[in-house]
Every structure is written in C-alpha cells, then in structure tokens.
Amino acid sequence: MDMGSKEALMESPPDYSAAPRGRFGIPCCPVHLKRLLIVVVVVVLVVVVIVGALLMGLHMSQKHTEMVLEMSIGAPEVQQRLALSEWAGTTATFPIGSTGIVTCDYQRLLIAYKPAPGTCCYLMKMAPDSIPSLEALARKFQANPAEPPTQRGQDKGPAAGPASSGGELAFLGAAVSTLCGEVPLIYI
C-alpha cells in the first residue's frame, strides 16, 4: 500500500452513514407528495370524527323522540314500565349507618334488611309503582325490633326458620340469598 493513500484516508475518512431523507422514510415519494398524503390523512380523520358525532347525535335524538311519543300515547303505565325497565335485572346494596344492610332486588321486587348483629333477615315486597327511598326503608326496618324469631315467638311458620339448603332461597335471587342465607327470614 502506498503511503499517500493512507494519509488521504486519515485526513478525510469515507462517510458510510445513510443520506438524510427527512422525517418520513418514504424513499420513492417526493416531498410535495408526502405533504399531500399527510393532508389527505388528516382530512379523512376529521371527516370520520364529524360523521361519528353526527350519527351519535342522531341516535340520541331518535331515542328521545321515541320515548316522548311512547309516553304521550301510553300515559302513566308506560312511564311506570320505563322507570322499572331501567332497574330490571339489577340489585343494589346499601349500608344503613352501622345498624344494618339493605339489599334491593329490582327484578324480583324484593327488599331485604339484615340488622348489624345478624340474628335475622327481614324481607319486604316492593311496590312497582313506588320504589321507596333509603331513608323510608331505614325508618321502616328500624321501627321493627331486630330480635330473633325465638324471642318473638315461633308464629311465623317455616318461613321464620333458617334456610337449610340453598335451593330454598333460590327464589330470592343471588344477592338476597347471600345476605339472608344463614339467618331466619321474617316477612313484613
């Protein structure tokens, strides 16, 4: 090797790095086509968002119109059915301070109250036209003394005894059966 070529390489070594192509690595497209592509993508995204918002608004408007029309034609019984249809298939469990737990089963229209000591469980049928408030339930259940049936007398029959198997409480639903499964039931 010639000494002159070594010195030339040392003074200016070859550059093996890739040539800069800009931010986006599309080698076959010129810059003006890249910009046009970006603008088209942004416009399409904006159109999709606007169309989605319009369709969602149209759906909400249609549901509202159907509900108003059904309520005006059907009067109170439709309003009652609509109010209960929102709650159908749901249960709600509420603590009443430190004194007990209330479970409302809106599908079976049952209300269960278990006092804090857990000696018994009160069951009450809920009227479909008037769902009581939590304050009214607390007053009603706390007005009844939370005594076990042995102290109140065994006049309640088999419904006052503790449930011996899970099949006996199947008609109550899962939430109420779990709450009242191990204690005697008292129907109000």
UniProtKB/Swiss-Prot annotation:
Name of one Pfam family that matches: SP_C-Propep
Gene Ontology CC terms, in alphabetical order: alveolar lamellar body; extracellular space
Coiled-coil positions: none
Gene3D superfamilies recorded: 3.30.390.150
Key words, A-Z: Disulfide bond, Gaseous exchange, Lipoprotein, Palmitate, Secreted, Surface film
Propeptide feature: residues: 1-23, 59-188
Protein's GO biological process: respiratory gaseous exchange by respiratory system
Segments for region (Disordered): 144-164
Cysteines engaged in disulfide bonds, as pairs: C121-C180
Main location: secreted
Entry's localization field: Secreted, Extracellular space, Surface film
Annotated BRICHOS domain residues: 94-188
Positions of S-palmitoyl cysteine lipidation: C28, C29
SMART domains (UniProt xref): BRICHOS, SF_P
Function text: Pulmonary surfactant associated proteins promote alveolar stability by lowering the surface tension at the air-liquid interface in the peripheral air spaces.
Miscellaneous comment as given in the Swiss-Prot or TrEMBL entry: Pulmonary surfactant consists of 90% lipid and 10% protein. There are 4 surfactant-associated proteins: 2 collagenous, carbohydrate-binding glycoproteins (SP-A and SP-D) and 2 small hydrophobic proteins (SP-B and SP-C).
Name this protein carries in UniProt: Surfactant protein C
Gene source species: Oryctolagus cuniculus
Gene: SFTPC
